[in-house]
């Protein structure tokens, strides 16, 4: 996507579709469990866990499920799984760069499944480092655009927490920060009574590839096929899809 705004808009629209998928809960729970295992089960002392719990709750994951995931991760409950973070790099139709983030307990299965999904949909798995340099790891917070709320209001609320820029995306405000400042920005926004739509570590493209309707449809088909895999947590790509093209593809 060209710049941050179009990328966030596309992710925001896709999130509406993704939310209908039954696999979303499982992926969010896995993130909570891994965060608890890595940094402990107390969200007050583990910002990554606090963010994972907040995201799970925002998607209506039941509290009991979240609590069990925290306990499995922290060792209070048996049944915890050793998940591994793996990122795969690929090229899709029209040379679009793709990053695939996985949390898996079976590296061989994840690699095979990702490769098959990519190649069957017109893509090619790339060597490590050949794609990732086209992206920057950032924190992205989306805020509901309440009546009377301006970009300046948002910037004032989150600037001291590490916000780098605020963008007006139409129905939401997007706040960009360093990935390490995501939690602080989310907390600052909450303290200012701003309604948080989402808060995620994101790979934002520094170089984009403009896509018309036909290649956009092919790229999105590939992305959705990869996202459907159980081991896949996130898929990022640098296709620049305008609102008009997105409407054509979605219709």
Curated annotation (Swiss-Prot):
One GO location term (cellular component)? cytosol
Q: What is its main location?
A: cytoplasm
Q: Where in the cell is it found?
A: Cytoplasm
**Pfam families, per this entry?**
TACO1_YebC_N (PF20772), Transcrip_reg (PF01709)
| Membrane-spanning residues | none
Q: Which domain of life is it from?
A: Bacteria
Matching InterPro entries, A to Z?
Answer: Integrase-like_N, TACO1_YebC-like_2nd/3rd_dom, TACO1_YebC_N, Transcrip_reg_TACO1-like, Transcrip_reg_TACO1-like_dom3, YebC-like
Task: Tell me which UniProt keywords the record has, alphabetically.
Answer: Cytoplasm, DNA-binding, Transcription, Transcription regulation
Q: Which GO terms describe its biological process?
A: regulation of DNA-templated transcription
Annotated GO molecular function terms are: DNA binding
Q: Which family does it belong to?
A: Belongs to the TACO1 family.
Its recorded name reads Probable transcriptional regulatory protein FRAAL2138
Q: What is the lineage of its organism?
A: Bacteria, Bacillati, Actinomycetota, Actinomycetes, Frankiales
